[in-house]
Structures are given as structure tokens and as C-alpha cells.
Amino acid sequence: MRAIIFSSLFPLVVLVLSGLSQAADVDPIFTPKADVVFPETVSVTYRQPVKMRDGVALSTHTYLPAAEGSFPALLVRDIYGNGSQPLRQRYARFATQNGYAFVYQVARGRYDSEGEWYPYVHETNDGEDTLDWIAAQPWSNGKVGMFGTSYLASVQWLAALSGHPALKAIAPAMSPGNYYRDVAYPGGAFSLLSRASWGIGLVGSRTNGSFPIDWISGIQHLPLKTLDESLGFRVQHFRDWLEHPSYDAYWEPLNLEARAPEMAVPALNIGGWYDVFLRSTIGSFSTMRKEAASDDARRGQRLVLGPWPHGWNASTTTGEVDFGDRSLINDEVMMLEWFDHYLKGQPLAKRAPVLLFVMGRNEWREEQEWPLARTVYQDWYLHANGTLSPEPPEADSGRLSYLYDPADPVPTLGGNIMRPELRGAFDQAPLDSRDDILRFLSKPLAEAMEITGPVSLRLFAATDGLDTDYMAKLIVVKATGEAYNLVDGVIRARYRNGFTTPQLLKPGEVYEYEIDRGATSYELAPGDRLRIDITSSNFPRLNRNPNTGAAFAETVEMRVARQSVFASKVHPSRVILPIIPKASTPANAP
């Protein structure tokens, strides 16, 4: 294992290998970013119409180094138009300064590109046609890399599906990979705030970066199927998402993790512990490493996980927690190493496949795999007296109950969400007065404990309704009293047996649910405690389950549900924690 130790005075790091440290070993990806400037002369072509196979022209900007000859190209395909201009200019300076052509293209149906925009569906063909165009240019040497974040990352994977030989490597940051699970329906519940503000909002801002709507109040509207019209638009893709609440043929083409065998491109996968697409970032890395179409692609997968929300590496603060200067990396150095190898044939820096940030300890660490091979999975049990411990319950019975009222849902406070004002780690104290949250608290830890890996919950519960939701949140309670969310998850009860065939409940019957709560890396300090919060709403992040069994997008009726959570020898509700043994070494460590 190569630990990365940070200076207490400067945002630099010294690598420690075999017990030795030297200033000469400072890793360049942890040094501050340098200013980038255009070379003295650079050739720029703005808004060139590049024709796709169906005749639709996409607005394309090209920046070329002043030197004679042909160059590898870095491509960004964007949907945010003029709002991306400052970043586009920095990308262009960075690329041309380092001997790359830079191509920036506005996606179909956005801003000054022709056609109609429907999220994701045109990006494979349009990406392939754009790669064709780049490879045919006299300034191109036929080698292309792609990079970008969020939708700008999605288009990279979708272009990779084309199998275009010019696409040599990609660097997707915070990209969805399973669009049903991570974009629209996590745990089967509709991702309301993100899908409404993004899916409807972008239509309203095709040519205007501002879209003045109070989303928090606006999405109170019912029925959800007419939410778009209530905001002044009719948005077909938003309606299609609502019309396909189960995983079906609509979503299958957009499960890119399942399509890994169709792709043969090395990828630098970048994610954040508080990013809405964290599971996809990890899933893409894992499936491509096992199932990609070529050995080069399987070996060429890298994973970087920092303490970031969506829109990575922009601030040291995530929610209410400041992780310090050490939490930022020099992404330009990292990208340059990556593309210089795959597009210019230079040696790739010797790095482990996984680089992750351990929160709490606030240290970067290299690992050989994900999940870590040395992980010890521990069951921590919920007890009827409100405690949480590694000891299983001894009583044959144990039940705790609460009322879930969809008209008075638990408000969203932190987590893996897009909205800047809500995402990240927050002290959960503002929710302490609510009686519709069950809380299970551990004793203070006697020694430090690291949790790194996927977290899940096995929950035994019953309701008096035909359908409902269960939410689970893993929280670290600091010795000073603050209670910060680490990971959370949801299961819509009708999808307890899978997301293809919903099954309503029998009121009063006890069911076992598995709640996937994503992943984290956090070291708890001595005196810290773990807490599990169980409830049935997280609004407006997720739509409110009306508890009626009706189609959620069509109904306006809601009912109060009585929820029961079981914690006993017969019904051992528990969280499964990935514990990293102290002073252990990773498998296959260099």
C-alpha cells in the first residue's frame, strides 16, 4: 500500500513508500494548478456546422496549436452551451498548450446546434459521426480522447458504444452508467428534484442560461404527470420517464454497465463520495475491468474517488464539512498523464488502479481493487431499545413504529444529490424533532474504525398500506455532537423482488427488504458513534409514495401509513458494514 501523507502547512503531499519519504517524491497530481495560457498563436474556428448522418448540423468549435503538422484531439461534447464558455476556454488553452487539438461541440438540439434534444438517445450516432469528422481533418492524426463531467461524461460512454477506432481513451467524471437505477429510479423511487430541475429545466434554458423557477415549491404539484405543464412546458422525455417506473425495454439500452462487453476503451473513472452517480462510477469501473471487449480496455480502467459532490474537485467543502486543501487534486496533470499515454504513446505514470480519499482521516490512498480484498464485512444490528451494535438481538420479538404522512414528508438534508444547496454532508440536527424517523445509535467507539466499501441494510418491516417506501441513512455522530450523513438509500416496497415486476404488499405482513446505500470511505475516530436513521420519505429529492398502491405519477390521493420496523432474533434488521482491518495491507500491493 502506498499511503499519501499531507503536509500540515501546504497543499502538497509526500509519497511514502517502504517507510521512506523524500521531497522529490511529491506527486504532481497533488500540486496546485498552474495558470494555462494560449500559445502565442492558435488557430480557432468557431461554430462550424458539422453534419451528422441525418443532415442535422452541430455547432463545433476547433482550437489548434500553432505548430505545423497533425495532432491528437481532445473532444468535449456539451449540452450547457454559453454557460460553459469559461470552462471551454480553459480546456482549449490547456489542450493547445500541451500539443493537442481541442474540439468542443454543442449537442443536438442545444443552443445553436440543429435538431431536437432528447437526453442520451442520439449521442452514440452523433458521437460516432463527430469522431469520423475529426479523424478526416488534415490537422488530425486520427487519435481522439474525450473528457468531461456528468452529461459530458455520459456522451463519452455512448460514443464508446460505437466502437469507433479513433477513440483511444476517455475520462468520464461523475457519469451515470445505469440510467434507471442512478438517474431516474434509485431503489425504485423517482428522483424527483434532480429529474425535474434538470429534465424540465434544460428545455426552458435551451438558449437562456437562467431559468427562474422555485423548484422546491414548484415540484409540490400533483399529479406528477402534469408537473411539466404546471411549469410552462410540455417535456416528452420527462413524461416518458414517468411512464416507465419499472426497468423495461425503455431503460435497457441505457444500462451501460450491462453493455460493457460492447466497449473497448480505457477509462479514467472519476467520482465523489457524495455524487449522485457514485454507484454508476464504481459500477462502470468494475464491469469494464471484468467484461470490456478488449484486454487493453480491461487493464486500462482507473478509479478516482474523492470527498466531492456532483461537479467534482471544485471546493474543499462538501455540504457543511470542509475536508481541507488536501481534498483537491490537480485534475489537469492527471488528465495529461492519461491522454499523453493513450494518444501520444508516453509511459503511463505508475499508479495503482484505485485512488480513494478516506474521509475522517482525510488521506488519499492507493488500492489495487474495488471493493478492497481485505474488507471484513460486519453485521451491526438494530435493537428495539434504539441501539445499534455488532451483537444480534436476543429477544424473540421487537417492534418500533411510526406514522408516515406523505403530506408532511421528511425534508431532504444532504446526501448524493445534484442540487448545490442540499447535497453533501450535513448535520442532521434540524430533523431531530421529527417523530417519523427511527434512530438507532451505537456506543462511542473505543478505537478508530474505517468503513470503506459498499454499504447495505437488511430491513424487516411491515405497513398497513399496499405500497410504501423505506429510507435508511448511515450517520457518524461526532464526539462533539454533530451528526453527519455518510450514505443513504431507499427501497420502494413494490420493487422488493426486483425492478422489472412490481408486486404490491399485503397490509400487516412482515417483509424483508434490502436497501443498497451506495459506498463510502470514512474513518471514525475514538469517541465517534454510528447511527442508522429509518424513515419513509426524503422530499423533494425523491417523490412521495402515496401509500395507496396507485400509479404514483397519476394520483393526487395520499394516505397516512403506519410503519413497523422489526429488530429481534426472528427478524434481525441489520446494516452490513465494510470494515478495513487496522494495519492491514491491500492484496497484490506493490
Residue ranges and their predicted role:
Residues 24-32, 48-49, 296-297, 321-324, ...:
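Glycine/threonine-rich phosphate-binding loop and adjacent beta-strand/alpha-helix elements that clamp
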Residues 32-67, 441-447:
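N-terminal cap/lid segment of alpha/beta-hydrolase-fold proteins
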Residues 65-136, 184-186, 314-323, 466, ...:
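Cap/lid segment of the alpha/beta-hydrolase catalytic domain
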Residues 97, 158-262:
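Accessory cap/linker subdomain of secreted extracellular hydrolases
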Residues 138-150:
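Alpha/beta-hydrolase fold nucleophile elbow
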Residues 149-158:
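Glycine-rich nucleophile elbow surrounding the catalytic serine of serine-hydrolase chemistry
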Residues 263, 269-271:
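Short beta-strand/loop motif that positions the catalytic acidic residue
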Residues 279-301:
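Active-site-adjacent alpha-helix of alpha/beta-hydrolase-fold enzymes
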